[in-house]
């Protein structure tokens, strides 16, 4: 009897910039098939400035609408999903879905600087979830949020000296050194699955 096993899939949930060439390049580095979720209905959307991208994101329905879109993708691909990485609004959308039973087969979710997580601290993820916050945020104090999430037994950490957007070359807070550090960690995480 032969059993066909679905390949592991990585879900990448973008920030308000959406599916940019930088995200496509990021996804190509992983040894597993990737699915990219963007807050915009168009395949590839580009905004020359973060404020324009943010206004377009709000016009699309904000985090709530994005979380619903992400839920549909998770549910449609739950048999093959093993990893989910989210950035900013994408991290918040993933966090809102992290208690969804459809995420139970994930080996790891890694959420970068999801600022709206602060509004939903009581969520209990059904899969291992790592929360990574920038040290500097305009709207809240990340150190206090991280301390509170840790008290709730969440895997939360603060990246010293970083600003919101440190993983995205289009963001004012981008930091190549920090991006490379985390990219290496994420690649190592998915390499284990690709080798199995």
Where are the language model's segments positioned?
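Serine-hydrolase catalytic machinery in alpha/beta-hydrolase-like enzymes
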Residues: 2-79
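Gly/Ala-rich beta-loop-alpha elbow adjacent to hydrolase catalytic centers
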Residues: 85-94
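A conserved short beta-strand
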Residues: 103-115
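Short beta-strand/loop motif that positions the catalytic acidic residue
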Residues: 125, 130-133
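Acidic catalytic loop of the alpha/beta-hydrolase fold
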Residues: 134-141, 148
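C-terminal catalytic histidine-bearing segment of alpha/beta-hydrolase fold enzymes
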Residues: 156-196
């Amino acid at each position: 009897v032969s059993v066909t096993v679905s390949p592991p899939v990585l879900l990448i949930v973008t920030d308000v910039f959406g599916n940019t060439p930088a995200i496509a390049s990021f996804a190509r580095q992983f040894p597993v098939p990737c699915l990219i979720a963007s807050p915009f209905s168009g395949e590839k959307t580009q905004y020359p400035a973060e404020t324009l991208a943010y206004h377009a994101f709000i016009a699309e329905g904000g985090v709530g609408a994005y979380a619903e879109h992400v839920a549909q993708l998770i549910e449609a691909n739950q048999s093959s999903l093993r990893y989910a990485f989210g950035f900013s609004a994408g991290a918040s959308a993933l966090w809102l879905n992290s208690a969804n039973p459809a995420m139970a087969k994930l080996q790891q979710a890694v959420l970068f600087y999801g600022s709206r997580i602060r509004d939903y601290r009581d969520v209990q993820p059904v899969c291992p979830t790592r929360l990574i916050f920038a040290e500097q945020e305009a709207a809240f104090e990340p150190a206090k949020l991280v301390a509170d999430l840790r008290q709730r037994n969440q895997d939360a950490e603060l990246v010293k000296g970083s600003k919101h957007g440190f993983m995205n070359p289009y963001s004012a807070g981008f930091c190549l050194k920090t991006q490379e550090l985390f990219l290496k960690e994420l690649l190592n995480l998915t390499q284990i699955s690709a080798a199995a």
